[in-house]
Amino acid sequence: MSDTQAAEPLAEPAAEPTGLNRWALRIEYDGTGYLGWQKQNDGTSIQGLIEAAASKLVRNRPVPSITAGRTDAGVHAAGMVIHLDFPDDAPIDARQIRDGMGYHLKPHRVVVLETAKVGPEWNARFSATWRSYRYTILNRPARPGLMENRVWHIKRPLDVDLMQQAANHLLGPHDFTSFRAVACQARSPIRTLDVLNIHRDGELVMIDTKARSFLHHQVRNMAGTLMMIGSRQWPVEKIIEILEAKDRCAAGQTAPPEGLCLMDVGYPDDPFNRS
């Protein structure tokens, strides 16, 4: 799964075999300098760091992981949810997982926020019913200093009202072919956007979106298109033409990864008991 690609709504997988204890983890990370979530042979990935840290808690035995969303290189997460399968003979509890992994993850910018024991049928990917993302634009003449690698810097003034007018046309179910990466492997381009809100806080323009799942690069491609409309390079009505074109070349550029952050993942029965 990429920065915005989530699970296809497939049949529920069978429960894992016994001999393992499944734990849900909520984690945050700064994606700068990493190769994204998925393990790679030629660099450091978030998944590789997580599994290595977990393995050290059980005498270097393998601890496989599944994530709610595979973020791309440079993309951040404030509330990613994963699950880990620890050997059932390992004497380990929630605090030991959080604090022990926190110790072994240093000095990397990857943190375990919460842990919760779950049943073998619970799956971080397939049990999720929604994912939410935020794309952040720094809208000012001066380049970012403190927020470098966390925002997309746009000098031209952005009209958030125009951006919201365009965004409203993307709500609900649509064929998002124009907004998915050419290499997207999803079987269907149909997705349903539940939320797509744009607001300004001083020099920051935030694009917040929520859906059950997203296509590869969908959020970043929507951000690139909305930027063109907010900067008055395209009219609001252009968004309708782009949707109807079903052609990636019709939409705006793919916004850079550093502005994107996975904010949260939702489940019918939240393992972390959040209200």
Curated annotation (Swiss-Prot):
Gene Ontology MF, one: RNA binding
Stored InterPro entries: PsdUridine_synth_cat_dom_sf, PsdUridine_synth_TruA, PsdUridine_synth_TruA_a/b_dom, PsdUridine_synth_TruA_C, TruA/RsuA/RluB/E/F_N
One Pfam entry name: PseudoU_synth_1
Positions of transmembrane segments: none
Catalytic activity: uridine(38/39/40) in tRNA = pseudouridine(38/39/40) in tRNA
EC number: 5.4.99.12
Binding site for substrate: Y133
Record keywords, A-Z: Isomerase, tRNA processing
GO term, biological process aspect, one: tRNA pseudouridine synthesis
Assembly and oligomerization: Homodimer.
Protein name: tRNA pseudouridine synthase A
Source organism of this protein record: Gluconobacter oxydans (strain 621H) (Gluconobacter suboxydans)
